[in-house]
């Protein structure tokens, strides 16, 4: 709204004013009055609402034919309910009277031209633009909240372009309009009024680099859509055609929330009278938007597509591993996409390269890949092969000296939805690995951490992963879906559970059963040898302490009980003070619904079965899960990674709408 408008009346000549439908105009009835006048009477033509604003303690409302006292504590306000068909077709008359006179001492006449001007967006979050009588400028979270939403137009709808749509200041395809939020400008009133007044669309300077606005002229040609606001373009004089009552615009988001951007932008339209110097703004209507956040999907969401790389090394190709992935995705009814060697340049760690998420508005949703700053062999794959129609792309570059291992996205995960001490996280919480507090070790880059935090809907939790050589959270934790009330379990790697299992097997008489039995390229280690190895015992005592520290953080920050956690047997060893998996790390699995692709641990064979596999099955299969153990030893484990590191899963978005939560 514009500041309070005051229309001054005159006894000498009629006054003319523009009145916006639904907007009150204050009328000055005190400045020009006949000498001796002490009361007045008001009348208005049909379509004009006249009412008095007065101090009830000092002014008495007249009854019947009595007149209003000409008191400074009584003010007149007028408004119109519809737009005028002609100029000055609404009329208000004010008659002034003296002490004992029935004849008016003088009269003032006010001619009003009604105009209907409003800027409308989807404040109700229904996917449709409807006329709103409420607050359009403010943005509120929650199921009772309101406010429009913008998508960052980070996909590429035109195959002829090599860049995301948001990089272009012109429309690349009509499909691109679906990624934008519609905005309607109502501009109903006499054409002659718009001939002498301007409608100006504005974007604040601080928001101009965050949005673009395209004006639609109803055609099916790209030339019918012109950019009118955006970077380097802060205002636009609307080109209204004679008789035109509604003009459609499309608003495009350009930047995600980040450390320097809360995600809120505003646009406004003003009715301006250029007939005065300086020009006078008669009315302003403002609408607000929030940029949709980038949202991660946890393992509990159904899988849609699994990505894996075809590679070649000194041991040959990973063709057998690819066959196992094909079998797993077939069981899980999930699409399989194999990245060829020419595109991955023999970089197999596709989990480290990128993270899949999505963005959503009431009218549209699409997946968005977050490209990590690691920039190794796969660095071009997300941009060149995944970015496309309705598949967006975002990244964050980091300054020199460049990325550390903790900047890879094996060090980025998200929990299922949780409730912590009465606080709900309906989209879960992001988990990232870091150094031990105050230790000065490796950390994920600030640019990435700031981006994740700024999305607001999945408040990040920092864990301690710097004790590991690679330093990724997926080396000691994962989540699996369950069909019970909780809906999931947290799996934690557990050296103590593994040593306990081996001790039990020793006491049962299987001490000579050997780890790595069946592997050609690895020396066997019997249970007796492993239990007697003081260095191995010491290393795993350290690893267990590190995992226990994270266990307590996860219980506190995710609201978990011990019954929500499953300990998966696992041993580690220290190399240059950092831990690596002693045998294939089973929590580093890929989760496809109820089917789990688990690294084959090559544990001691007892009664024809691997005791580690048997233990894991006994823990997980009662939860309705199917354990499929897959050999990744040569192609992944020996290179300090496992199945999760070498795969990536795009999952279905949450059914829950992010705008219904309260961060």
Swiss-Prot record:
Active site, UniProt feature: 645
Binding site for Ca(2+) 3: 353, 371-372, 375
Record field: catalytic activity: L-arginyl-[protein] + H2O = L-citrullyl-[protein] + NH4(+)
Binding site for Ca(2+) 2: 155, 157, 179, 364
Top EC category: hydrolase
Broad class of the protein's primary localization: cytoplasm
Enzyme Commission designation: 3.5.3.15
Binding site for Ca(2+) 4: 351, 409, 412
Keywords from the UniProt entry: Calcium, Cytoplasm, Hydrolase, Metal-binding
Cofactor: Ca(2+)
Molecular function in Gene Ontology: calcium ion binding; protein-arginine deiminase activity
Gene3D superfamilies given in the database record: L-arginine/glycine Amidinotransferase, Chain A, Protein-arginine deiminase, central domain, Protein-arginine deiminase, N-terminal domain
GO CC terms: cytoplasm; cytosol; nucleoplasm; nucleus
Expression sites (tissue/organ): Detected in epidermal keratinocytes (at protein level). Epidermis, prostate, testis, placenta, spleen and thymus.
Subunit-level organization: Monomer.
Family in the record: Belongs to the protein arginine deiminase family.
Protein's name in the database: Protein-arginine deiminase type-1
């Amino acid at each position: 709204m514009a500041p309070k408008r005051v229309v001054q009346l005159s006894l000498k000549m009629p006054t003319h004013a523009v009145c916006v439908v639904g907007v009150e105009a204050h009328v000055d009835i005190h400045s020009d009055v006949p000498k001796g006048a002490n009361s007045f009477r008001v009348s208005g033509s049909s379509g004009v609402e006249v009412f008095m604003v007065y101090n009830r303690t000092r002014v008495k409302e007249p009854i019947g034919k009595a007149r209003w006292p000409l008191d400074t504590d009584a003010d007149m306000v007028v408004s119109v309910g519809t737009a005028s068909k002609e100029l000055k077709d609404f009329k208000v008359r004010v008659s002034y009277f003296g002490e004992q006179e029935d004849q008016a001492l003088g009269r003032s006449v006010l001619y009003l031209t009604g105009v209907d001007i409003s800027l409308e967006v989807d404040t109700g979050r229904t996917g449709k633009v409807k006329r709103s009588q409420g607050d359009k400028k403010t943005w509120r979270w929650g199921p009772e909240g309101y406010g429009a939403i913008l998508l960052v137009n980070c996909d590429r709808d035109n195959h002829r372009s090599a860049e995301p749509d948001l990089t272009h200041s012109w429309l690349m395809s009509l499909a691109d309009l679906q990624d934008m939020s519609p905005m309607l400008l109502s501009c109903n009133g006499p054409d002659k009024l718009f001939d002498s007044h301007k409608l100006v669309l504005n974007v604040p300077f601080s928001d101009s680099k965050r949005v673009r606005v395209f004006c639609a002229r109803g055609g099916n040609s790209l030339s019918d859509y012109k950019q009118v606001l955006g970077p380097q373009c802060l205002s636009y004089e609307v080109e209204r055609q004679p008789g035109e009552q509604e003009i459609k615009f499309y608003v495009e988001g350009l930047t995600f929330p980040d450390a320097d951007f809360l995600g809120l932008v505003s646009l406004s339209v003003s009715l301006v009278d250029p007939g005065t110097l300086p020009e006078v703004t008669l009315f302003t209507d403002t609408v607000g938007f929030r940029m949709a956040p980038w949202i991660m999907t946890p393992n509990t969401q159904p899988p849609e597509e699994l990505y894996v790389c075809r590679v070649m090394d000194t041991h040959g190709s990973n063709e057998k591993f690819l066959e196992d992935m094909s079998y797993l995705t077939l069981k899980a009814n999930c699409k399989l996409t194999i990245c060829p060697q020419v595109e991955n340049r023999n970089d197999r760690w596709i989990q480290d390269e990128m993270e899949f998420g999505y963005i959503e508005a009431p009218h549209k949703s699409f997946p968005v890949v977050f490209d990590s700053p690691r920039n190794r062999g796969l660095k071009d794959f997300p941009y060149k092969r995944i970015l496309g129609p309705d598949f967006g792309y975002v990244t964050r570059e980091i300054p020199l000296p460049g990325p550390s291992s903790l900047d890879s996205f094996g060090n980025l995960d998200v929990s299922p939805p949780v409730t912590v001490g009465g606080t709900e996280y309906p989209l879960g919480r992001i988990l990232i690995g870091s150094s031990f507090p105050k230790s000065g070790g490796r950390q994920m880059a600030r640019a990435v951490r700031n981006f994740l935090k700024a999305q607001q809907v999945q408040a990040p939790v920092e864990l301690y992963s710097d004790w590991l050589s690679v330093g990724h959270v997926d080396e000691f934790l994962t989540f699996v879906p369950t069909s019970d009330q909780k809906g999931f379990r947290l799996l934690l790697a557990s050296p103590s559970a593994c040593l306990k299992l081996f001790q039990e097997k020793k006491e049962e008489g299987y001490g000579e059963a050997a780890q790595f039995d069946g592997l050609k390229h690895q020396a066997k280690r019997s249970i007796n040898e492993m239990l007697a190895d003081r260095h191995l015992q010491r290393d795993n005592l350290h690893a267990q302490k590190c995992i226990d520290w994270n266990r307590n953080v996860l219980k506190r920050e995710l609201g978990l009980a011990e019954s929500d956690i499953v300990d998966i047997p696992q041993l580690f060893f220290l190399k240059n003070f950092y831990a690596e998996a002693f045998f294939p790390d089973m929590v580093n699995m890929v989760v496809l619904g109820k089917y789990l692709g688990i690294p084959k641990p090559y544990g001691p064979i007892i009664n024809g079965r691997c005791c580690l596999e048997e233990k894991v099955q006994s823990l997980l299969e009662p939860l309705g899960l199917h354990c499929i153990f897959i050999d990744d030893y040569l192609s992944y484990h020996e290179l300090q990674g496992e199945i999760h590191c070498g795969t990536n899963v795009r999952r279905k978005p949450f059914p829950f709408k992010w705008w219904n939560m309260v961060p």
